[in-house]
Amino acid sequence: MKIIVAGDGKVGATLTRQLTAEGYDITLIDSNKDVLSSSMEQFDIMTVHGNCATKDTLLKAGITDTDLIIAATSADEVNLLCCITAHGLNKNLHTIAPVSYTHLRAHETDSYL
């Protein structure tokens, strides 16, 4: 299974460590070149420098041949946009975008309708 992890912070690094240990083919996207270099050496994975919410970056990461993308940046809005853009490029893609702001969670919006 090919997985893209977008964001190499605490959550993304933990996911990358666990998923590579389980034998998954991981590509890591982040906007910080130094963090990516460290992860590339530590985990021996493909990395892509750029904004995970952009079409060009996702295509460089191989989104069209990917089974799952996990958007794990520190910004909920970026995570959601990343998954929406990625799904537009690969309709068979599974997406995960953790959302920490309660006002962005779908089940919370019912009280506003």
Regions found by a protein language model. Name each.
Residues D8:
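Glycine-rich Rossmann-fold phosphate-binding loop(s) that bind the pyrophosphate
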Residues G12:
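N-terminal Rossmann-fold NAD(P) dinucleotide-binding loop
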Residues L19:
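Aromatic pocket-lining residues of Rossmann-like dinucleotide-binding sites
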Residues I26:
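Short beta-strand element of Class I
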Residues D30-S31:
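Conserved acidic E/D residue at the C-terminus of a beta-strand in Rossmann-like folds
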Residues L36:
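Short alpha-helix immediately C-terminal to the canonical SAM-binding loop
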Residues T102-T109:
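Conserved small/polar residues in nucleotide/adenosyl-binding loops
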